[in-house]
C-alpha cells in the first residue's frame, strides 16, 4: 500500500458559505486560489442549520435503505450511472486485480427538477427532504461557479454557470455511498483513484477514508463537522482552460480493512449534456460523451485503465501527480 501522509485538514482552505453568498470579494479571491492550487476546499456550513439538519435526516434514511436485503435494493437497479441502486464490486478497486467495495444509490437531478413519477420508493416517501436538500446544494454550487466566473473575468456565455441552464438535461445527481464493514479485503476494497467527471462535487461525511494525491504523495482529507468538502471536476478544469485543478483522489479504509460501515453523501454538479469543451488531448467533446466514456472506464480492468488517461483526467503521468502552477 502507498505511503500516506498524516492528516492535512489545516492545509486546505476553509471558505465561508455565508461570505460567498454575500459576494465578499476577498472570499471569492480565496475561492479561486483554492480551486486553482488545491482543487479541494472546506466549505463552512455552520450558519446554515437547515442544510445540516436535512443532511442528518437523509443519512438516517439512507442507512435504513442500505440495510435492506440485497434483492429488495436490486429492484432499484436501473443499470444507470445517474439513477438508482448499484451493488458492491462493479468497478475496478484500489488494489490491482480486485474490484471496488462500495454500494451506491443515485437520485437524478433531472428527475427531482421535473417531478417525474418514476422515483424510487425511498425518495418518493421522503420527497420533501430530498427535494429541499438537492435544490439548496444545487443553488450553492451554481453560486460558487458564479463567483469563480466573476473573479476570473468571464462574461456572458463564457461564464461557468451558463453551461448549467436549469431546463436542460444533465448528468447531475445526488449520490449516497456505503463502504460496508469488512473482515478482509480479498473480495475488494475502497474506491479506485480518479478525478471527478463534472464541474463541482459537494461531499459530506463524518468518517475518514478520503485521500487526495499531491506532489508529495497521498494525503488524508479529514472530515470536519459542519463543513462540506468541495472539489473541482474535469469539466470545470477543461472549461477554465486548465486554470482550475481537477485533483486525483480515492477512498481507502484507514486500517488494513474497513472496520465500520462508512457513509458518504455526494452531490455531483455536471454541465448540461450538450455542453462542449476540449478534453485532455485537445479534442472537442460533449459533457455527456466525457461522462459516459469515463464511467465505462471505471468498469474496465486495471490493465485496460493503465492504457488510457481518462480515469485520472490527464492529471497523472507514470503514477506521478502533474502540478499546474497558478498565478493570482
Curated annotation (Swiss-Prot):
Pathway field: Mycotoxin biosynthesis
Gene this protein is translated from: gloE
Coiled-coil segments on the chain, per record: none
Biological classification of the source: Eukaryota, Fungi, Dikarya, Ascomycota, Pezizomycotina
Biotechnology: Pneumocandin B0 is the starting molecule for the first semisynthetic echinocandin antifungal drug, caspofungin acetate. Pneumocandin B0 is a minor fermentation product, and its industrial production was achieved by a combination of extensive mutation and medium optimization. Inactivation of three of gloP/GLP450-1, gloO/GLP450-2, and gloM/GLOXY1 generates 13 different pneumocandin analogs that lack one, two, three, or four hydroxyl groups on 4R,5R-dihydroxy-ornithine and 3S,4S-dihydroxy-homotyrosine of the parent hexapeptide.
KW Hydrolase (keyword) present: no
Positions bound to Fe cation: 194, 196, 249
Name of the protein described by the UniProt record: 2-oxoglutarate-dependent dioxygenase gloE
Cofactor note: Binds 1 Fe(2+) ion per subunit.
Domain spans labelled Fe2OG dioxygenase: 170-271
Catalytic class of the enzyme: oxidoreductase
Cofactor(s) required, per the database record: Fe(2+)
Documented EC number(s): 1.14.-.-
Family in the record: Belongs to the iron/ascorbate-dependent oxidoreductase family.
Annotated GO MF terms: dioxygenase activity; metal ion binding
The keyword Protein transport appears for this protein: no
InterPro entries: DIOX_N, IPNS-like_FE2OG_OXY, IPNS-like_sf, Iron_ascorbate_oxido_reductase, Oxoglu/Fe-dep_dioxygenase_dom
Keywords: Dioxygenase, Iron, Metal-binding, Oxidoreductase
GO biological process, one term: small molecule biosynthetic process
Residues that, per the record, bind 2-oxoglutarate: 262
Listed Pfam families: 2OG-FeII_Oxy (PF03171), DIOX_N (PF14226)
Gene3D superfamilies: B-lactam Antibiotic, Isopenicillin N Synthase, Chain
Function comment: 2-oxoglutarate-dependent dioxygenase; part of the gene cluster that mediates the biosynthesis of pneumocandins, lipohexapeptides of the echinocandin family that prevent fungal cell wall formation by non-competitive inhibition of beta-1,3-glucan synthase. The 10,12-dimethylmyristoyl side chain is synthesized by the reducing polyketide synthase gloL/GLPKS4. The thioesterase gloN/GLHYD exclusively interacts with gloL/GLPKS4 to maintain turnover of the polyketide side chain.
